[in-house]
C-alpha cells in the first residue's frame, strides 16, 4: 500500500508540473481522474500477436508467462482501484495492436488528443 501511495504521489507531482507526461500503467488514469487534459488509453492484442512480440521484445517469454504477468497486473489494478483491469469504460480509447501497426496506434492516439482539444 505504501508503494502505491508513493507512486500515486509521484504521478500527481509530475502531472502538476504541466510539462506533459506519459505514464505506463500504475493506475495512472485513476490517480489522475478529474484532472484537466488527462487522456487514458488501453493497448491490447490477441494471443498470437502477444506471443510473436514476446519472442522479439520480452526475452522469448511464453504465453503462459505473459498471462501470469497480466493476471498480476489485473489483481494489482483491482486491489487499488476497485475496478476491472482492461474495462473499456475506464479509458478514453482502447486499441487492439494485433489489428494495426504500433505506429498507426500512436497516430490514433495523437489524432484522438488533437480532436478532443479541438485542433
Describe the role of every protein-language-model region:
Residues 21, 38-40, 94:
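Short, well-ordered beta-strand core segments
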Residues 116-119:
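C-terminal helical "lid" subdomain and adjoining coupling/linker elements of P-loop NTPases
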Residues 34-57, 63-69:
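Conserved phosphate-donor/acceptor-positioning beta-strand/loop module used by diverse small-molecule
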Residues 18, 35-37, 91:
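Short, well-ordered alpha-helix to beta-strand connector turns
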Residues 60-103:
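Small-molecule kinase domains that catalyze NTP-dependent phosphoryl transfer to phosphate-bearing small molecules
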Residues 8, 102-110:
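Short, amphipathic alpha-helical "lid/cap" segments that border enzyme active or binding sites
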Residues 1-20:
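ATP-dependent small-molecule kinase phosphotransfer cores
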Residues 25-30:
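Short, polar loop motifs at secondary-structure junctions
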Amino acid at each position: 500500500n505504501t508503494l502505491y501511495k508513493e507512486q500515486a504521489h509521484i504521478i500527481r507531482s509530475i502531472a502538476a508540473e504541466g510539462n506533459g507526461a506519459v505514464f505506463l500503467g500504475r493506475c495512472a488514469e485513476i490517480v489522475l481522474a478529474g484532472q484537466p487534459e488527462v487522456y487514458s488509453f488501453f493497448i491490447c492484442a490477441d494471443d498470437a500477436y502477444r506471443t510473436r512480440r514476446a519472442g522479439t521484445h520480452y526475452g522469448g517469454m511464453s504465453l503462459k508467462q505473459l498471462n501470469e504477468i497480466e493476471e498480476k497486473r489485473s489483481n494489482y489494478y483491482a486491489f487499488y482501484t476497485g475496478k476491472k483491469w482492461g474495462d473499456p469504460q475506464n479509458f478514453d480509447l482502447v486499441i487492439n495492436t494485433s489489428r494495426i501497426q504500433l505506429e498507426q496506434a500512436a497516430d490514433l492516439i495523437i489524432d484522438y488528443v488533437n480532436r478532443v482539444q479541438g485542433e
